[in-house]
Amino acid sequence: MITGLLKKVFGSRNERLIKQYRRTVEQINALEPKFEKLSDDELRGMTETFRQRHAGGESLEALLPEAFAVCREASKRIMKMRHFDVQMIGGMVLNDNKIAEMRTGEGKTLTATLAVYLNALTGKGVHVVTVNDYLAQRDAEWMGRLYNFLGLSVGVNLSQMPHDQKQIAYNADITYGTNNEFGFDYLRDNMVYDPSQRVQRPLHYAIVDEVDSILIDEARTPLIISGQAENQTDLYQRMNGIPKLLERQIGEEKADGTGVEKPGDYYVDEKGHQVYLTEAGHEKAEQILSQLGLISEGESLYAPQNITLMHHLYAALRAHSLFHRDQHYVVQNDEVIIVDEFTGRLMTGRRWSDGLHQAVEAKEGVTVQQENQTLATITFQNYFRMYEKLAGMTGTADTEAYEFQEIYGLEVVVIPTNRQAQRKDLQDQIYKTSKERYDAVVRDIRDCYDRGQPVLVGTTSIETSEYLSDLLNKEKLPHQVLNAKQHAREAEIVAQAGRPKMVTIATNMAGRGTDIVLGGNVEKQAGFIEADANLSDAEKAERIAKLKDEWQSLHDQVKAAGGLHIVGTERHESRRIDNQLRGRAGRQGDPGSSRFYLSLDDQLLRIFAGDRVRAIMERLKMPEGEPIEAGIVTRSIESAQRKVEGRNFDIRKQLLQYDDVANDQRKEIYKLRNDVLESQDVGDMVANLRESVLVEVFREYVPAESMEEQWDIAGLEQRLRDDWGLELPLAKTIEGAQSIEDEELLDMILKAAREHYDAKVAQVGRESFAGFERSVMLQSIDTHWREHLAALDHLRQGIHLRGYAQKDPKQEYKRESFELFARLLDVIKSEVTRVVFNVHIQSPEELEQASEQIEEGLAHLENVQYKHDEFAEGAEPVEQAEPARSNTAAAALAAMGGEAALAGMPKVGRNDPCPCGSGKKFKQCHGKLS
């Protein structure tokens, strides 16, 4: 109440910001006549003038009015479009590291050009981030004309693009690309073995289009580059039959033992998107697994050796109970392809993690692909927070304003529309059953069709869109279907969705990127005429004029019929997605309307609000086919949506808190890796590592401040001989001296080690040896970082159970992951030192060859999978790499001397510790190569 009163007196913060920006818009408008008088060359020359002024110390804020005025004038000449005042405000919001919420059709793409042009003057590069390759390429070509006219270079960064073209794209002043590709390029740049192989420059400024989709919807899904792990495809197929033998329990058992409507073997928690075996289910599963010969008679599923089976069983249960064909995925060309739940697009190449994708493949009877091991991973939150400046734009961000501020420090500013919105949002209609709901939808579509009004029908799954299409076919109503399966025709279908009597059924319209213009889109047809070489300029002009006249007539006809009508067949769990669908109607002051048709069978209502609404319907004794249409019901649905949004926010926040721990470690490892990569000579680094490791070894046998009687000199001599090949007469030295300090012994060892190392370097030359050392260090860092990521993943999966011991899982995760990281650094240090110290090469030629062999062994980016990992549901965005060798020492020794290097090793049992000192079993280390 008090907040509302203050807003009335002082205006909201949003209104105050808009007022400030309007003052700057007045300055820009005052400059317009001045720049209109300039020739094209003079206007283009302003870019270089601005660059020099900025280099001379003038801030971008000081340049802003003139730069925006120049950009607007160039757009008028090249694009035949003049930025509206509200677009100028949008450009300033983007430059101020904020999110501009602009309604659909208000020209976000053109608005972005203002902030992009201004920030490109720094020469540090601007990234414009879109949701798919089609939009990246379209916007780069479309707006590239404007930037090129102003003397700026434009690049487009697409997936599967050759390496040299990527470097050119990133070196341009402005780079368009998708969020996934920018993130994967960052990870790939931190896996290269030569600085010249990197593609990205330091991250300076990014504008994220559809910012809510990228920074919120996809923030639950880390990007992952992975390589193949152990092959267990047969196990997935054997496990696939088990869910069919188990019965589903209806209702969840409460603390008092009530709540179960029908007992069963497993319970599906739709709200938490999880499956749980009941006690009876455990016993039944154990019997089935015993019959299959997967566990011994009477053995528990929880025995340590059966944990993997437990993991596979739950993956199979989730695949059968929670993931449905044509809703969560489609099957094409012997592959299971994920459908993006927010946009309805196919996510080719992405795979769910934790064995879920393999379980779905087994369920659908397609080829089961191997599981993957993570090589590198990052979340969008942590990737985008690395930019010096970050801004975004979307049609719907205000509902998530708190999250943008909390996670990214980005303020949302709602930009006023250029013309007053005229869309009518009608109240939801709720029916008892799905059949009644779809009958009402078909009646509404028929009514609009008869009046010549175009209709856009939004569905939440491919299955629903195809079911509705069948109903319309029976009614002989012509229509177009736009879902993940019709991806290729997307732009064409959307462009014509505003023509009279046009009925378009679409799965979630988020990120479609094409406006629905009343009367249809003439730009595309005009483009075909322009491209026709057989027509003269006069004929082209005549045909385009005729086309525009026809369009005007259709446009007026549709406006008279009420504009575009939006029909929602189900509420999405996010209000924002519903608002995006509604936002397709009523663009730029056009008329339009929207209505959602719901049924009590809908997932959102069933889980969160079904009982309450059903009780209202029964109390009112609603006859069949009669809907409820009341504000109280609509409010209760919005309350349910808020609950889901809150839960999803908590999931994303929790993911970020855990990933922040890994992120700090990632930064350190990548910094270390880049230091190695960029140093001219890593000899000093190796010398420091060698000294540090030898001091630790020495102190194991000669503790600090200890008496001579406590020293284990025989053990130290043996260790130096076995691990380092150093024959040092330490015992004789001590005997021959009247008294000796431990520091003298240490100096003696360090000196001998230094001489041993210098002799090796002298043998082959400093330059050749430095290349070898760099390869060994990079290989060691990469191998153990991969293993560390797997360990962190394993730690995270079970860390929540610490809560039962009254411990804070997050604090426990921080503590244990830090211990793992300290151990990782120790292992890298000792392994690099040992490999470099023990290498045996006779000639420079052999050393060169060995170094090349190692680098070939490291070319693990040829067969890589790129994943965008679904955190909440187990899905992961993946890239597929060659199975990497698990031990650097083995790889390096094999490279140095091949079989001969291994032949010199003592005879060891497969389960004994490996003599290389890695701490692993022999079969998991050098035994793999022998």
UniProtKB/Swiss-Prot annotation:
Subunit field text: Monomer and homodimer. Part of the essential Sec protein translocation apparatus which comprises SecA, SecYEG and auxiliary proteins SecDF-YajC and YidC.
Protein name: Protein translocase subunit SecA
CDD domains: DEXDc_SecA, SF2_C_secA
One cellular-component annotation, GO: cell envelope Sec protein transport complex
Binding site for ATP: 87, 105-109, 515
Its membrane topology: Peripheral membrane protein
Keyword Zinc: yes
Cofactor-binding details, from the entry: May bind 1 zinc ion per subunit.
Enzyme class: translocase
Function: Part of the Sec protein translocase complex. Interacts with the SecYEG preprotein conducting channel. Has a central role in coupling the hydrolysis of ATP to the transfer of proteins into and across the cell membrane, serving both as a receptor for the preprotein-SecB complex and as an ATP-driven molecular motor driving the stepwise translocation of polypeptide chains across the membrane.
Pfam families per the UniProt record, alphabetical: P-loop_SecA, SEC-C, SecA_DEAD, SecA_PP_bind, SecA_SW
Catalytic activity: ATP + H2O + cellular proteinSide 1 = ADP + phosphate + cellular proteinSide 2
Reported cofactor(s): Zn(2+)
